Structures are given as structure tokens and as C-alpha cells.
Amino acid sequence: MADLEPDSKLGPDSKPGNDRDARAAARLLAVQALYQMDIAKTPLENIIKEFVSHRLDVSMDGVDMPEGDAAYFEKILRGVVENQTPIDRQIDDCLSENWHLARLDSTLRAILRCGVFELTYGGDAPTGVLVSQYTDIAHAFFDGPEGGMANALLDRVGQGAAPDTNLFGTQTPE
């Protein structure tokens, strides 16, 4: 199981204050907020208020990252919550026959939901950037195969792959 705080594998890739970095920080914060909503059952409005008031400053292993873009953080979070049923269906359609979203770690579910939301409903960044950033977030939280799984699933969603083909390239039963 992943910790709520990522390790040093994910860090700022340019100078603080950059809009791109603020959005990358907002993506990480949205993942953390969804995790908290899932685990602690914190209501959406409370989590938005908490994060915007107290948690937009991101620090990992003592390294300060750019402040998260509050509006973008809220857009991702609200978008995932409002579209959770079709997002979850889209994720389930990409998983192998023996795997379902409910079986995944809460952190991985949050990463996939945020990534699928941006790829499908609201991301204005290029597909490759979104897949890369959410894959980096997965690698920051997990040492195992979860990063590769996130990459494969988000890449499939980003390319608009047929939903009847799972991550292992086999057709799902009709």
C-alpha cells in the first residue's frame, strides 16, 4: 500500500513559479485529495477548502515545489467526482478480466481517476504530458509495477483505444 506522501522520485523539473509546474503540483494535490476523500470519507467541499487554505504548498523530502494552481486543482477534483461513474467504467474496461478498479490500491485509483478525467474530459495539456506526469506520480508513490500499469492504462485511454481491449492485449468476453 502506498503512503500519502510521495518519495523523492517526483520532483520539480524547472524553476518555481512556472504555470506548467503549478499545474503539475495541482495534479499531485488532486491525487492526494481524492485519496483522502476515499480513505477518510471527507466531503468534496471540505476537502477543497482544506487543500486551498492549507495545502497548496507542496514539499517532498524537504524540497519545495511550486505552489499548486488552486483553480486547476479544483477543476480536476470536481471533474473526477462529477464524472466518476463513466471514469470508473473506462478504467475497468482497460483492466484485465481478473482485475477491477475496486481491487486496486486507493492511491492508484486516485491517480488513474485524475488521469482519465484529464485525458477524457478536461485536460488542455498534450496527451503525452498528462500520461507522463501521472506516471511520474505513480512512480513517486510506488516501487512496484503500479507505475507501468498507470502508464499503460493512461496511454491506452489517451490514444482512444477500443474499450474491449484490456491492458494485456486480449479481447474481453462479449
Locations of the language-model features?
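N-terminal interaction/assembly modules
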Residues: 1-174
